[in-house]
């Protein structure tokens, strides 16, 4: 076991997570169509503060993230402060770590708490796949800049004459990695082939995810942590996630064609997480500050780790890299965990990470460790379903996982939970949570 790194303040306080909340998650272009991420963020933070009954002035910092950036609101965190009635002097800044963005936001607030610069803060993220920054071609962009500097009408007309019809076409946001040109689904296909993960295994995991998420809603387990969203024209509120298949059937999964490798692929729309809109946030405090305010924390942040790997091969193996580091820093082993929640970007990616966490060879030859991180116990894994069912508003998923895991730990009488995710750019994140 390597060095244990306790997350405590200089006074010995643990980092408490006192509350967490999210909007329902909605598939792209459905319930939240036309609602920008900043409005989703304001919605969830405003409701989180109202439910917690914590005075707004108690919150000294807000760190928030958004992956699909909107040029008109580059600092979503500050817009949330200004749009929710929070103290105007509240420090606020934005972060981005792709699919691990709200993990990063939580880590940043935790570091401020440990440094002693704040005693309470909010971390979270919001994304909209329905309100997108549609761009213009590089040629048109250059001409528009030059036109702005032109002094006469003839100069402007001459510049516009250089354009062709194709230059006027809108440019949608890129879905491929900037550095490689590969889509995440391409990497998921590569990992499925490399690690021998079959179509049947992927479909079975997706089916399991939907079944468990549907059961979680049916049992009322998510009611406390998901707000009701009222959206224009205010005729029908959104109460639950709208991606979950309550009648999920394995036979239906088998009918779908591959989405990326059309001839030989196994990754489909059904065994991948869909584009989603939503927001999530958590309130963090020092343990002593929570006691002063008479608050009972949901749990505590025990450790965290971020890793980075090559983007050309196995780019989505972030959990297999970051998990052993987070466990090491927490002073725990895989067998001591009560719950494991892994982000399901793709069923193939999830199954590959599970396989390698239990691989002695991967531990020795790739991680340089003496032993495997540990086998993933199915009875502890994604017990309420995962991102394939709930959906994945990129910057919000981490905060969803943290809140969901802490509530489930408390229902089980406490223990330790691992939350972990892969992210674009070969990034990985893992956090160990503790509940009493």
Curated annotation (Swiss-Prot):
Q: What is its EC number?
A: 2.3.1.16
* Keywords for this protein: Acyltransferase, Cytoplasm, Fatty acid metabolism, Lipid degradation, Lipid metabolism, Transferase
GO BP annotations of the record are:
fatty acid beta-oxidation
Catalytic activity annotated for this protein?
Answer: an acyl-CoA + acetyl-CoA = a 3-oxoacyl-CoA + CoA
The pathway noted for it is: Lipid metabolism; fatty acid beta-oxidation
Q: Name one GO cellular component term.
A: cytosol
- Into which EC class is this enzyme placed? transferase
Name the protein family: Belongs to the thiolase-like superfamily. Thiolase family.
Q: What is this protein called?
A: 3-ketoacyl-CoA thiolase
């Amino acid at each position: 076991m390597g060095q244990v790194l306790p997350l405590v303040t200089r006074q010995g306080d643990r980092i408490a997570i006192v509350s967490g909340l999210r909007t329902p998650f909605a598939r792209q272009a459905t319930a939240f169509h036309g609602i920008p991420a900043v409005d989703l963020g304001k919605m969830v933070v405003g409701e989180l503060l109202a439910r917690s009954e914590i005075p707004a002035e108690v919150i000294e910092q807000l760190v928030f993230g958004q992956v699909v950036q909107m040029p008109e609101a580059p600092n979503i965190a500050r817009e949330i402060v200004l749009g929710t009635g929070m103290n105007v002097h509240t420090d606020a800044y934005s972060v981005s770590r792709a699919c691990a963005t709200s993990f990063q936001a939580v880590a940043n607030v935790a570091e401020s708490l440990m440094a002693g610069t704040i005693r309470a803060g909010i971390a979270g993220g919001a994304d909209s796949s329905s309100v997108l920054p549609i761009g213009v071609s590089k040629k048109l962009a250059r001409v528009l800049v030059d036109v702005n500097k032109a002094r006469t009408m003839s100069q402007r007309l001459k510049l516009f004459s250089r354009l062709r019809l194709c230059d006027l076409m809108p440019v949608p946001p890129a879905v491929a990695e900037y550095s490689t040109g590969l889509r995440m689904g391409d990497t998921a296909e590569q990992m499925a082939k490399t690690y021998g993960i079959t179509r049947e295994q992927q479909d079975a995991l997706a089916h399991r995810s939907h079944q468990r998420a549907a059961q979680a809603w049916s049992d009322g387990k998510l009611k406390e942590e998901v707000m009701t969203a009222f959206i224009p024209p205010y005729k029908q509120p959104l109460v639950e996630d709208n991606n979950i298949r309550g009648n999920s059937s394995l036979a239906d999964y088998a009918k779908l064609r591959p989405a990326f490798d059309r001839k030989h692929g196994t990754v489909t729309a059904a065994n991948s997480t869909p584009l989603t809109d939503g927001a999530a946030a958590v309130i963090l405090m020092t343990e002593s500050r929570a006691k002063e305010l008479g608050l009972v924390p949901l749990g505590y942040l025990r450790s965290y780790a971020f890793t980075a790997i090559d983007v050309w091969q196995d780019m989505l193996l972030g959990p297999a890299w970051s998990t052993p580091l987070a466990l090491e820093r927490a002073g725990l082993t895989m067998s001591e965990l009560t719950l494991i929640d892994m982000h399901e970007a793709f069923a193939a990616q999830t199954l590959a990470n599970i396989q390698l966490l239990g691989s002695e060879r991967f531990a020795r030859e790739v991680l340089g460790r003496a032993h495997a991180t540990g086998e993933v116990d199915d009875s502890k894994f994604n017990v309420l379903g995962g991102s394939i069912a709930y959906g994945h508003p990129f910057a919000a998923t981490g905060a969803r996982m943290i809140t969901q895991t802490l509530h489930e730990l408390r229902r089980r009488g406490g223990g330790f939970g691992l939350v972990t995710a892969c992210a674009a750019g070969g990034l990985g994140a893992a956090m160990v949570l503790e509940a009493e």
